[in-house]
């Protein structure tokens, strides 16, 4: 089993964790038909995708 030789510093710990932060969703699209905002390449809550109804409830 590997055992560290020296204690990692706060700086090294911070550098390792620098990519762990969550980013805000910035790329929201507007549906052509309903005008509703949605994630890119996802359907809207109404069931529309690229202006067409793809899911019926």
From Swiss-Prot:
For this UniProt entry, the molecular function terms from Gene Ontology, in alphabetical order, are: structural constituent of ribosome
A Pfam family matched in the record: Ribosomal_L32p
- Assigned protein family: Belongs to the bacterial ribosomal protein bL32 family.
Using the record for this protein, list the coiled-coil segments as residue ranges, or answer none. Answer: none
- Gene behind the chain: rpmF
**Polar residues composition bias: which ranges?**
24-33
**Source taxonomy:** Bacteria, Pseudomonadati, Pseudomonadota, Gammaproteobacteria, Enterobacterales
| PANTHER family for the chain | 50S RIBOSOMAL PROTEIN L32 (PTHR35534), LARGE RIBOSOMAL SUBUNIT PROTEIN BL32 (PTHR35534:SF1)
What is the species of this protein?
Enterobacter sp. (strain 638)
User: What protein does this entry describe?
Assistant: Large ribosomal subunit protein bL32
């Amino acid at each position: 089993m590997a055992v560290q030789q020296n204690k990692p510093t706060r700086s090294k710990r911070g550098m390792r964790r620098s990519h762990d932060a969550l980013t805000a969703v910035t790329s929201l699209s507007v549906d052509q038909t309903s005008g509703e905002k949605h994630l890119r390449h996802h359907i809207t809550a109404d069931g529309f995708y690229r202006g067409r109804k793809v899911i019926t409830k």
